[in-house]
């Protein structure tokens, strides 16, 4: 049977080993040594407001904070698997997508210029301390013209062939444009919280719709 250890961090010291708290009663958790899944890593989400907050610090403090989060040093958190939004999430400075030109099925107006202001430099700074940092990306909302109704904060993807193809191409363009910036997107997730109709950017999907979109 494997021993379970309690690890915690405080502002004064990280990765401390805690002393188990005694409690009455018998534990009903039994570990049999069988492993079903592999944990690839831990991390957080890159977003615009996070980068704006980081920039309020002096440059040396920014570097120190990023090192504490991402470096492989014994005293760092060693974050190595993070996520990021495709377009706006609930921590964007305001709502946007990477192509808000209605009817642009060829994505001629697709652009990551806005991401070059915050998200891309944020990720690049983190990668100076974690060169092998893995990223997965997901949209909170498609471009509004691809949705019914055409708004960021709720609704569904218009289920028409040309619209579905354009949205698939949207993901491909995103990955390729980030690759041009030296950033590899390791995974794409089709939708953040697909069953949540939120007051911030969101889009509802059924399981059948996700299956069909990913398959086709």
Give the positions of each predicted feature:
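Extended, charge-biased low-complexity segments
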Residues: 2-5
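Active-site neighborhood of glycoside hydrolase catalytic domains
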Residues: 163-190, 194-216
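N-terminal catalytic cores of secreted or lumenal carbohydrate-active enzymes
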Residues: 10-185
